[in-house]
C-alpha cells in the first residue's frame, strides 16, 4: 500500500473522469423507451474515454494507472475544484514518468472471453 501511495504522490497529474447525472437524466426523459440503458451507455462511453486517454498518455511517454478511490474521495474532490453535486466521479487516472515496467498479468484465454459469430 505504501508503494502505491508513493507512485500516486509522485505523479505529474491526475485525470478525473466524471459522469454528469443531469445529462443522463435528461436523456432518460427525452427517450423514455431507452431510459434503462442510458446509465450503462454512459459508463461505456466513460470507459472508452479512459482507454483513449491512457493510450494517448502512453504514446507521449507517460505511465498511467486507473484507480477507483471513490466514493472515499468524492466530497473532497468536489470541494477542491468547486464541482457540482450532479457530477459523479467514475475514476481517477494518475500519470507521470514510468519508473518500472508493468508486471506480467495472467488473463483468461481470449477464446474463453470473446466469441465471434459469422
Give names to the regions the model predicted.
Residues 82-85:
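Short, hinge-like loop/turn segments at secondary-structure boundaries
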Residues 62-64, 87-91:
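A short pocket-lining beta-strand/turn micro-motif at the edge of beta-sheets
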Residues 1-2, 89-118:
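C-terminal helix-cap and adjacent tail motif
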Residues 16-17, 94:
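Short, well-ordered beta-strand micro-motif
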Residues 11-14, 90:
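Short, surface-exposed beta-edge/turn micro-motifs
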Residues 21-23, 99:
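Active-site/binding-pocket entry motifs
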Residues 15, 21, 28-79:
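Small-aliphatic-rich amphipathic alpha-helix that forms the alpha element of a beta-alpha
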Residues 3-8:
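Short, small-residue-biased leader/transition segments that mark boundaries at the very start
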Amino acid at each position: 500500500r505504501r508503494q502505491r501511495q508513493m507512485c500516486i504522490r509522485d505523479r505529474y497529474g491526475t485525470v478525473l473522469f466524471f459522469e454528469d447525472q443531469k445529462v443522463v437524466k435528461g436523456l432518460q426523459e427525452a427517450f423514455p423507451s431507452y431510459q434503462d440503458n442510458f446509465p450503462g451507455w454512459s459508463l461505456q462511453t466513460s470507459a472508452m474515454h479512459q482507454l483513449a486517454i491512457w493510450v494517448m498518455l502512453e504514446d507521449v511517454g507517460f505511465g498511467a494507472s486507473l484507480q477507483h478511490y471513490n466514493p472515499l474521495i468524492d466530497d473532497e474532490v468536489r470541494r477542491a475544484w468547486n464541482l457540482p453535486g450532479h457530477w459523479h466521479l467514475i475514476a481517477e487516472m494518475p500519470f507521470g514518468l514510468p519508473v518500472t515496467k508493468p508486471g506480467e498479468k495472467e488473463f483468461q484465454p481470449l477464446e474463453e472471453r470473446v466469441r465471434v459469430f459469422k
